[in-house]
UniProtKB/Swiss-Prot annotation:
UniProt keyword Nucleotide-binding, yes or no: yes
Organism: Streptococcus pyogenes serotype M1
Record PANTHER family: ISOLEUCINE--TRNA LIGASE, MITOCHONDRIAL, SOLEUCYL-TRNA SYNTHETASE
Role description: Catalyzes the attachment of isoleucine to tRNA(Ile). As IleRS can inadvertently accommodate and process structurally similar amino acids such as valine, to avoid such errors it has two additional distinct tRNA(Ile)-dependent editing activities. One activity is designated as 'pretransfer' editing and involves the hydrolysis of activated Val-AMP. The other activity is designated 'posttransfer' editing and involves deacylation of mischarged Val-tRNA(Ile).
GO molecular function, one term: ATP binding
Positions annotated to bind L-isoleucyl-5'-AMP: E554
Motif ('HIGH' region): 57-67
Name of the gene this protein is made from: ileS
UniProt superkingdom: Bacteria
GO cellular component, one term: cytosol
Sequence motif 'KMSKS' region, residues: 595-599
Name of this protein: Isoleucine--tRNA ligase
Keyword Ligase found: yes
EC assignment: 6.1.1.5
Species lineage: Bacteria, Bacillati, Bacillota, Bacilli, Lactobacillales
């Protein structure tokens, strides 16, 4: 027998190298085979409910790292709730209608307008479902636990029917109407867009300063006066029908030196404009309030038969321009709102493809709208006073990445103004994480216009509206309920397969159709109406779910997307929000803080991360970042996270190895019988349990990450395990000292494994497979630990906090001795502590082997008054470090004066000799194989 065999060196097959890319799919297969999701739901049946509603990602392409952040975050929450005694099902969903799928088919050479519509829509459907399958596999590879066999998809007939019922309820209340006001129009998509489909980019535009000649000055201005206006969209001058001034603003009539014309501009902008126009000097002829100029008539700059009326508007400012806004009601929301008050013509001179229409004039007809600036400049002639290039923020179609325009076209709208205050009241009842989300959503709802819900596309849910012979729109409850039933049975495809009369209830009549003829709407619904009604199609109808949901969790862009649309439809139909709480997250950027894009080559694929590092590393990264703000990720950052993971894994491996001979049923030492340092660690660990439990409740994953890393590296590795290994290795296997520490080891190991399962499910499942004394087959079926408190807890914490200060001071003294070559390792030291009475009382109260705790071989405690001048001194304590006396014990590696060669060929100290002689009689009788001496 070898001497080292008398040591209790921890043994385990749990590998240091994780091998996550290979092992994780094996665990996922085991979970699926064991129907783990189903079993967890069965375990929690009848318990308090927690229902997170999954915002549906768009079914197109593999998932990106933003998807991963979102789904992993949801998985962490749902897993933590499930393990904390909540009935917490997770039904994943997909958004499956919309333009991107049409664009994919177009790139494949499929021409929608040249084929049967039903056949085309079936191709869209099949493509969408193939993308659902692809993304489902991607999410499962991340270890996300969900009801993957029963997701919701917005193309499902039942979902479509429930969506129609939401529409019908809103129509019944009068919230659906048709109007021809300006909407965001994407010429690249040939469709109207909702606010949620807009993104902004900075672009350069040519702005023009020009003048309209006064035609009828109403006795205030003479006909030799010109009113100066400014535009950043020259094409809209073709549809200009008015000039808007601020009613309370001051305007001056000025005559530049050498000019026979006089001009009207805002007083507050005159100096800057004079510089732009090259007016070296000018004479001020008159001053007027904007309200005085109302109803003055001017001529259109080149189409002089068109009159442009001076009108009043509160949206006019002195921030830029001339203080006078040219007004084209067909091309702007403010223009429309103020123009209709004065009954101005709503002229639209750009078609659905962005081409100038015939009514723009022969010089413009057929030209692309943003290419006509040179023509406008030419037509303005000497009425053009200046032009300049400006850089400004401009709206773009978020899908095609092309600029859009405001354009008045007949559309269907969902009113927001009719019940806006009700929505705002519901926002105030909702909990927001982070808290600033409330203000953001509140302001968006407060300031938004009505919602344009019609789209001029094919792949989507049809608007269930019919038209009588006289043009009356029909969307009564009887009709929409019937359409919903048809969709539920056949899918929305039936809308395109049957004539209008066959889609109406049997025997349906309407006074507007004396001949019994009807037509149907050909527009489809905005896809945000699809996902925005999911509270009805999922939470309100699926078994084991509830409405309103406990939580919606999405990216911060969803304040104007899903959070917004869901809130509108839910309040419209039922008078309350669809959620009790909202959690929003920032965007994922690259390691330099830049947006990810294919062109930059900085995209991080979750699948690539899973192949290189493993999904648990990506999950740990999610827990490590502050998702209240934008977060960064790169392979380098993931490498750093992987290093942190390695530290956690190897620490837990140490605990596994050193509890391999520990049976909790027979070897556990009661808290009252633990050593004081073991009690201290038990208390510290239970504080960690409380911290993590609270952080899960607050959805603060980063707090969990920081707390765990600090506990593992500081409290365990750098303190407790640093000296505890000397006890568990050296003391007799069944000794009280060893079993005490193993009790703490095992308690920490089991509970921290449970606590980490929502974040690192693959790793904790592997650890759990080595814990043979735990009854649950999978850690995911276990319950979360509950933090305990102990008698005299605060006193114990205070005493050990004071010791930690003393320990740090002792380490500084040992380091100085090491630098002075007095010792090498700290175990070579004889440390003398010169202590005040207060420190002596502390050391006595600790009731511990202080030499063991400080990892020195020998320790002496003396009076502070006796400290020599060269002692390393601190307040109340001083240290002298000398080389320990004696030889190194081959077994304990400590220097001890009792160390000597024993008759059984072991060079050991008395303490080790006693352990050997009491526990290894055969080795004592036969002698050990070899000795270093």
């Amino acid at each position: 027998m070898k001497l080292k065999e008398t040591l209790n060196l921890g043994k385990t097959a749990f590998p240091m190298r994780a091998g996550l890319p290979n092992k994780e799919p094996q665990w996922q297969a085991a979970w699926e085979q064991a129907e783990l999701y189903k079993k967890r739901q069965e375990l929690n049946a009848g318990k308090p409910a927690f229902h997170l509603h999954d915002g549906p990602p768009y079914a197109n392409g593999n998932i990106h790292v933003g998807h991963a952040l979102n789904k992993i975050s949801k998985d962490i929450i749902v897993r933590s709730k499930s393990m904390s005694g909540f009935q917490a099902p997770y039904v994943p969903g997909w958004d499956t209608h919309g333009l991107p799928i049409e664009q994919v088919l177009a790139k494949q050479g499929i021409k929608r307008k040249e084929m049967d519509l039903a056949e085309y829509l079936e191709m869209c459907r099949q493509y969408a479902l193939s993308q659902v399958d692809k993304q489902r596999d991607d999410f499962k590879r991340l270890g996300v636990s969900a009801d993957w066999e029963n997701p919701y998809v917005t193309l499902d007939p039942q979902f479509e029917a429930d969506q129609i019922r939401v529409f019908g309820a809103m129509a019944e209340k009068g919230y659906i109407y048709r109007g021809a006001k300006p909407v965001y129009w994407s010429w690249s998509s040939e469709s109207a867009l909702a606010e949620a489909e807009i993104e902004y980019h900075d672009i350069d535009s040519t702005s023009l300063y020009y003048a309209n000649k006064v035609k009828d000055g109403k006795g205030i201005l003479d006909t030799n006066t010109y009113i100066v206006v400014w535009t950043t969209t020259p094409f809209t001058v073709t549809a200009s029908r008015g000039l808007t001034v601020g009613p309370d603003m001051d305007y001056l009539v000025v005559k530049p030196a050498g000019s026979d014309r006089q001009y009207v501009v805002a007083e507050g902008l005159l100096d800057s404009l004079a510089g732009k126009f090259g007016w070296e000097s000018f004479e001020t002829l008159a001053s007027h309030k904007g309200a005085d100029l109302e109803y003055i008539v001017t001529e259109h700059p080149w189409d002089t038969d068109v009159e442009e009326l001076v009108i009043l508007g509160d949206h006019v400012t002195l921030e830029s321009g001339t203080g006078i806004v040219h007004t084209a009601p067909g091309f702007g929301e403010d223009d429309y709102n103020v123009g209709t008050k004065y009954k101005l013509e709503v002229a639209v001179t750009v078609d659905e493809r962005g081409l100038m229409m015939e009514n723009a004039g022969p010089d413009f007809h057929g030209q692309f709208y943003n290419k006509v600036t040179p023509i406008v400049i030419d037509k303005l002639g000497d009425l053009l006073l200046a032009q300049e290039v400006i850089n400004h923020s401009y709206p773009f179609d978020w899908r095609t990445k092309k600029p859009i325009i405001w354009r008045a076209v007949p559309q269907w709208f969902a009113s927001v103004s009719d019940f806006r205050q009700d929505i705002l009241d519901e926002i105030e009842k909702t909990t927001f994480h982070p808290s600033w989300g409330e203000t953001r959503l509140y302001n968006m709802i407060r300031d938004r216009g009505d919602w344009v819900i019609s789209r001029q596309r094919a792949w989507g849910v049809p608007l269930p509206i019919f038209y009588a012979e006289d043009g009356t729109a029909i969307m009564t409850k009887e009709v929409t309920d019937h359409v919903a039933d048809l969709f539920q049975e056949n899918g929305s495809i039936i809308w395109w397969q049957k004539e209008a009369k066959d889609l109406l209830p049997e025997g349906f009549t309407h006074p507007g159709s004396p001949n019994g003829e009807f037509t149907k709407e050909t527009d489809i619904m905005d896809v945000w109406f699809d996902s925005g009604s999911s509270w009805n199609g999922v939470m309100n109808t699926k078994e084991n779910l509830s409405y309103p949901a406990d939580l919606y969790l999405e990216g911060s862009d969803q304040y104007r997307g899903w959070f917004n649309s869901s809130l509108i439809t839910s309040v419209a139909v039922n008078g309350h929000a669809p959620y009790k709480a909202i959690l929003s997250q920032g965007f994922v950027l690259d390691g330099k803080g830049e947006k990810m894009s294919k062109s930059k080559g900085n995209i991080i694929s979750p699948n690539d991360v899973a192949k290189q590092y493993g999904a648990d590393i990506l999950r740990l990264w999610v827990a490590s970042v502050d998702t209240d703000n934008d977060v960064r990720v790169s392979m380098e950052i993931l490498g750093q996270v992987s290093e942190t993971y390695r530290k956690i894994r190897n620490t837990l491996r140490f605990l596994i190895a050193n509890t391999s001979d520990f049976n909790p049923a027979t070897d556990t030492v009661a808290y009252a019988d633990l050593g004081t340092v073991d009690k201290y660690m038990t208390i510290v660990f239970n504080q960690l349990v409380a911290t993590i439990t609270d952080a899960y409740e607050r959805y603060d994953f980063m707090a969990i990450y920081k707390a765990v890393v600090n506990f593992v590296t500081v409290d365990l590795s750098a303190f407790y395990l640093d000296f505890a290994k000397d006890v568990v290795y050296i003391e007799a296997a069944n000794s009280l000292e060893r079993r005490r520490m193993q009790t703490v080891f095992y308690d920490i190991l089991v509970k921290i494994t449970k606590l980490l399962t929502p974040i690192l499910p693959h790793t904790t499942e592997e650890i759990w497979s080595y814990l043979e004394h735990e009854s649950e087959a999978f850690v995911q079926l276990a319950e979360m630990p509950v933090a305990e408190t102990f008698s005299a807890q605060e006193d114990i914490l205070e005493a050990w906090s004071a010791f930690m200060t003393l320990r740090t001071q002792a380490q500084k003294a040992l380091e100085e001795a090491r630098n002075a070559k007095i010792i090498g390792k700290s175990l070579e030291a004889h440390l003398t502590i010169y202590a005040s009475e207060e420190v002596k009382t502390l050391l006595t109260a600790l009731d511990s082997d202080i030499a063991l705790l400080l990892i020195v071989s020998q320790l002496t405690i003396a009076d502070l008054a006796d400290a020599p001048a060269d002692a390393v001194a601190f307040e109340g304590v001083a240290f002298i470090v000398e080389h320990a006396i004696g030889e190194v014990c081959e077994r304990s590696r400590r220097i001890d004066p009792t160390t000597r060669m024993r008759s059984y060929n072991a060079f050991v100290c008395d303490h080790s000799a006693k352990i050997i002689e009491e526990n290894f009689p055969e080795a004592v009788a036969e002698g050990f194989e070899e000795s270093g001496k």
